[in-house]
Amino acid sequence: MLHFLPAPILFVINFVWLSIGTTLISIPVLLMALIKLILPIRPVLKVVDVVNQLAFKCFCLNNAFLIRLTNKADWDIQGFENIKINGSCIIISNHVTWADIVLLCHLYRGRIPITKFFLKQSLIWIPVIGQVCYAVGMPFFRRYSRAKILKNPK
């Protein structure tokens, strides 16, 4: 719809929209994280998970709207007919751009359960984003050098 605008204006629209949307969506997730810490009992944890999944769906919908609003993208997607919505699946992608997460959420939205990503441990320190990813249960990992692994393989 707005793809005809000059790139600097599209950048501002995307940046502002993503910043506001991400901040608004992160508020309930961070509140749920506090509740999860204070009341770690099964019924409360189930409610927290439902709220977090809803927030993540809102994040994906917000991003999908922005992609449609500011881009003229023609998608050629094949293979969705074999995806089982109720089952788990592993998506393997060659990490090419910072937009991978946003694009995968957009493309698989409504077709598979909530997408979780393995994230580098250092990303947990990014304000708001890192804490939200931790709160919704995304796994973090550390990368070790070959020498360090050989020295201590545990």
Describe each model-derived feature in a short phrase:
Residues 69-154:
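Soluble catalytic domains of membrane acyltransferases
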Residues 1-89, 103:
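Membrane-anchoring hydrophobic helices of lipid-metabolizing enzymes
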